[in-house]
Structure formats: C-alpha cells, structure tokens
A protein has these predicted regions:
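Conserved, single-site charged/polar hotspot
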Residues: 2-553
Length: 553
C-alpha cells in the first residue's frame, strides 16, 4: 500500500526506513505537550510588481526615507526612468498635504523652473511650492491653508503680481503629498495624471546595494508614497519579483529548512504573487496595490530579512511557477497540517482539482506543535459579540460537521437566546484558533479514550492507561503529564486530549496544525525534502497533478 501515492513508490528504496517507521506506529502514540486571486501575467518580459507595505507603512501621518540621495521618476507603461535627483542630509519626510491651494496656470518642464517661480512668489510672504504632476510636468501651488477663507486672503496678495494667472481655488483632493528635505520642500499631486512618482536610492549601503531606508525596514527597488484618497500616506514597494521573493521566502519558511523545501517555497510564493498581481509597476491612485506584505497576501519584510540560503533557493528556481492544465495556478500554503491537508472545497467552498486533501505523514517535525486553547464562558461570549454573533449565555460548543480529514467544518454555539453556526475559516477567525483541526472538551468528558478491536470484539480503553510500541520498537507506558496524545494512522494523525476542564464555565480546544490546510504544508515539505524528494516532486504531490514551468511560456 502506498502512503503517499505513486510519487512515493518511485523512491521506495530511499524511503523504506521512513515508511516502515510510519507503519510501525500505525496505532502507536506520540506524546505532545502544550505549547489566500487576481489576474495572471500578460507580459513575461516585465517582472516588476507592486507590494503594499501596509504592515508598517500603511495609513501613516508621515513616512521618512532616510537616504541622503534619491531619484524621482515615473513608471509609464511598465517603464521607469529617473527624471530628477534630490539630496538631503536629513533624509526626506512625506506627509499628507491636505488644504486649499491655487495653482499657477503655467506649467513647467522641470523642477528647477517651477522652483524659480515659486521662490519669487514666496518673497511676498506666502507659501508657494513646486509640484510634481508627471514626467517633465511641474506646476506651482500657492496656499495649503486649512480653510478656503485663508487661501483667498493669500490670493488677494498675489493675484495682481508678476503677471501670473491662477486656477480657481482647489480644495483637498486626497492625493497631494508634501515632501520635506533639509533645506527645501516640494509637493506631489497624484490626482492630475492619476499617478504618483516613484523614488529609488542613489546612495549605496555597505554591501554596495542601492536600498531604500524607511527606518525599521529597508527595501530594494523603488518606493511610491501617496495618499490614495485618504488623509494619510502609504508606501508601496515597486520591485523585481525575484528580489521581492528574497524578502518573502525567509519570512514564510524557516531559512534552516532543507534546500529543496526552500525551493518549493520560492516557486509557490512566485506563483502566488503572479496570480495575484501579474506584472505591473505603474502607479494607480485608485488601487495602490493588490499584494501586501502581511499574511493577507505573503509576509514580506524587505532587504533586512534576506538570508543567503533562501536567496539561493530563489535564484535556483528563477522564473518558475506552478501550472495545472497548462495554466498558472494560485499556490496556497500553510505551516502545519496535523497529518493531512484539506480539500479546498471544505475551506473556501470553491473547486480546484489540484487542491485536494493528501496525507501529510512526512510532517514528523511540525513547526507548530499540537496545541491547547482554553476559553471561559465569558471569553467565548465576548468573541462572539465582537463578531456580531451574540447568542446570549453560551450553553454548549458542538462540532456539528467534520471533514474527512478531521477538521471542523461546522461549529454550533448553543446559547440562551439562540444558536449560531460557524463555518470553516470563520471558526478560526472568531475564536483565534491555529487551525480547524480540533476537538472541544467540556467538564465531565473522558477525552483520552479509543476503541480497539481485538479477539474478543471492540473494547474502549483509556490511552493514558495503555502501553505503546514506539517506532524504535521499545514498549513504554503513556506519559500522563502531557496535554494530548497523537496517534498515527495510515493516512492521517488523530489527537486524543488527556484532560477535561474542572469548571462548567470552561471549554478546551485541543488541536493540531497551523493555517487553513489547503495546498502545501511547509513542515511536510521539509520532511519530504529530508527524505530525499526534489522540489518538483514535492510540488506535484501537494498540488495534485500540477507541474513546474517557466512563467510566461
């Protein structure tokens, strides 16, 4: 019998020791203590993408680029060029430029020309600044006042001077940014051409790399800072996808994992990003980004997170993505399965033949150990209320429907004023659980029981009172001081909690796994790599029937 399908049979000699060990523990017990599409690429020649830096630089009152030399330019039809260089010994501070302005009717082809005119107007004792509108397109704005009346007072001082004509009064448009350097300032107005400029580092770090320094984090590529319709500033990193992956792979998978597992992560992260955003670098004020640097997309911490081991994995798989049926596909992944991955239909309700549940028995060193989460009655009620699911006083917590892999698909909460049924991913979100592979234990339950079949028929026994044969062949008594027992079956793992709460006001959630369970298990991929599988084989296993190919071909 093949535990992992035909893929494993091809490696039978190399893996025999591992498979035999798994079979030995078919009913042996291990003791464990407490402890998500957009559009695909249409232009394979252009590999810059846009990543929203929402984790640290989204919706801020100000963002500072600490570099002393930066270049300003616009990306038009996926082609960027630096139009102007700026220097500042104190770096560059970007803030929203809300307020009322008048604009000179005349346009200017350079910052220098616009600044000369602005300087003349400033001699009248008013605020006048050059404004970046687009490539070779500058204006001069006067004002920046909190009220229209204040702006009109300024206009009264300048309207008959120097022969300049002005626009009508312009209120805040949600797209203006003020940039302050050590001895000068200028404005950016993204609304006129529906685009913001992008900035690149012109000074080099100690390793000779041009890296933009935003304080807590540094980034390769370019940075775009805009308001995007809000009274705050947000940074977007425009970066080559391979350089982006340098900052993703070590954040999504431990850099000390096997090199083949790191390659799996690199290919999957590349596929995920390309399916989410395609190749697109141009500014778009109506949608700053589709991909961000958090778990909502993929965790990305930029240049400072890079590791030589994960960089090598990215380089070794350069340009490769996951394909199914001749098309690039989204590659979902997660930390730990707890014995088996899950069908995508059981998690998000959609169908995808390559995202089927598969046994994950090489996940022998899980990144996330089996876990226990305890809630009091009042804590459960607060969680429900915070998600607008109030049921009054909680009476019972009942896993109502289980998937074939042992995950809770429907969880019923029975309360004094009604019932609420939570489904799949909502369960994790509401109760902050690592996964949906769990058992609920209440006062009075005898959780560590299992039914064994013998010569005298079925018998219910307590695991804590049993002796077990380990994978090494030794016989030991169960350790009763640990929180739950993990039993390895032919194609999954099962958990048996040891203890029940002493109070009727408590519920224990005993579980395994970490993440949604769809696609590739990172811990399992590492186990398969250690057992001798290559990254292409691992990908084809977790994404059933999928292959690795060159993006854009």
């Amino acid at each position: 019998m093949s535990l992992l399908g035909g893929c494993l049979n091809r490696k039978s000699r190399k893996k025999r020791g591992m498979v035999l060990a798994l079979l030995l523990i078919f009913c042996s017990v291990f003791l464990c203590g407490e402890k998500e599409a957009g559009y695909a690429s249409q232009n394979a020649g252009m590999t810059d993408i846009r990543v929203g830096l929402s984790a640290l630089y989204g919706g801020k009152t100000q963002i500072k680029i600490s570099n002393t030399k930066i270049g300003l330019g616009y990306c038009i039809k996926d082609s960027y060029q630096t139009d102007l260089e700026f220097a500042s010994s104190t770096g560059f501070v970007f803030t929203p430029a809300a307020g009322y302005y008048y604009s000179l009717a005349k346009t200017y082809s350079s910052y220098a020309n616009a600044e000369r005119v602005a300087a003349v107007i400033r001699n009248l004792g008013v605020s006048a600044l050059p404004v970046a509108i687009y490539r070779n397109y500058w204006r001069v704005y006067v004002g920046g006042t909190a009220t229209a009346g204040q702006a009109e007072q300024i206009y009264a001082k300048i309207k008959d001077r120097f022969g300049y004509s002005y626009s009508v009064l312009m209120p805040d448009n949600g797209h203006r940014v003020l940039v302050r350097a050590d001895r000068y300032e200028f404005l950016i107005d993204g609304e006129k051409k529906k685009a913001y400029p992008q900035f690149k580092a012109l000074d080099l770090d100690g390793k000779g790399n041009a890296v933009l320094d935003l304080g807590e984090r540094r980034y390769r590529g370019r940075i775009e800072i805009g308001c995007f319709g809000k009274n705050s500033v947000t940074a977007v990193n425009i970066i080559n996808i391979e350089s982006y992956l340098y900052g993703v792979v070590p954040c999504e998978m431990q850099a000390n994992y096997h090199s083949e597992a790191l390659k799996v992560q690199a290919v999957c992260a590349r596929s995920f990003a390309l399916m989410k955003v395609g190749y697109s670098a141009d500014s778009n004020i109506s949608r700053a980004y589709y991909l961000e640097d958090t778990t909502k997309s993929q965790v990305y911490r930029g240049y400072g997170a890079e590791d030589s081991r994960t960089n090598r994995a990215v380089d070794a798989t350069r340009g490769e993505a996951v394909y199914y049926g001749g098309k690039m596909v989204p590659t979902y992944y997660f930390s730990t399965s707890g014995g088996s991955t899950e069908n995508v239909s059981e998690v998000w309700g959609m169908g995808a033949d390559y995202l089927k549940a598969v046994p994950d028995l090489y996940e022998t060193e899980p990144e996330k150990k089996p876990w226990l989460v305890s809630y009091t009655r009042s804590e459960l009620e607060k969680k429900l209320s915070a998600n607008k699911l109030s049921v009054g006083t909680v009476r019972a917590v009942i896993p109502q429907v289980m998937t074939a892999t042992g995950r809770v698909y429907l969880l019923k909460i029975r309360g004094s004023s009604g019932n609420s049924i939570l489904q799949a991913g909502t369960i994790r979100e509401v109760f902050s659980l690592p996964s949906t592979k769990f058992k609920v234990v209440k006062q009075g339950d005898v959780p560590d029981t299992v039914t064994a079949l013998g010569g005298w028929g079925a018998e219910t026994i307590r695991i804590g009172e049993s002796y077990m044969l380990s994978a090494q062949g030794s016989v030991t008594k169960a350790d009763t001081e640990l929180s739950q027992y993990i039993v390895a079956g032919a194609d999954n793992l099962m958990n048996y909690p040891q203890n029940a709460p002493e109070s009727a006001d408590n519920w224990y959630f005993y579980g395994m796994g970490y993440g949604h369970g769809v696609g590739m298990s990172q811990s399992g991929a590492n186990g398969m790599a250690k057992a001798g599988y290559g990254y292409r084989e691992i990908i084809s296993y977790y994404y059933s029937g999928a292959t690795v190919g060159r993006a854009g071909t």
